[in-house]
Amino acid sequence: IEELERAAVIGYKMHTTAMILGKPGVTEKFVGGQVSGIASSYGSMVSFPTIFSQHGEIMHGNPSMAVLEAGRLALCDCGAETVNHYCSDNTRTFPVSGKFTQKQLEIYKVVEECHDAALKLSKPGVKYMDVHFAVCRILFDRMKELGLAKGDTDAAVAAGAHAMFLPHGLGHMM
C-alpha cells in the first residue's frame, strides 16, 4: 500500500507541476521534460513516456516544441514508477490560461458527470462493460445537448460513434 501511495503522490506532484508550468509562451516539450524530472527527483522513474500536449485529440501524442497558447487546453498524461515497480497513471486536462472558456467548461462538466456516474455504478458484481456502456450513453446524450452529436443514443453507442469522444474507452484494465 505504501508503494502505491508513493507512486500516487509522485504522480500528483507531476500533475501539479504541469499545471504550474503550463502557461502561455512555454513549449510542450519544456513542460513535459520538467514533469518527467519530478519522478526522477523523488528516486523513481516515469511509468511511461510523459504525454503533454495541446492536441489532446491525438491519443498518446508526444510533447513537441509547440508553444502553449492562451485559450487552449493542455492534456497531461503521466505517472511514476517506484523502485518496486508500482505505478501511477493519471490524465488531466486543464486550461493553459488558467480559466476554462464557457464551451470548455461545459465539456469539462460532462466529463465530470461521466466520472461520477462510473464511480456510482462500479460495485462488486457489476460488469466493467456495463459501466463502460452506461457512461458512453451519458456522454453521447450530453454531446447531443451541446450540439456536438446527433442521432439515437443507443444506436450510436452500438455503432461505436461514442468513440469519437472516448477513443481510449473507460479506464485501463487491471
Go through each PLM region and give its residues.
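Active-site neighborhoods and metal-handling regions in enzymes and metal-associated proteins
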Residues: 1-174
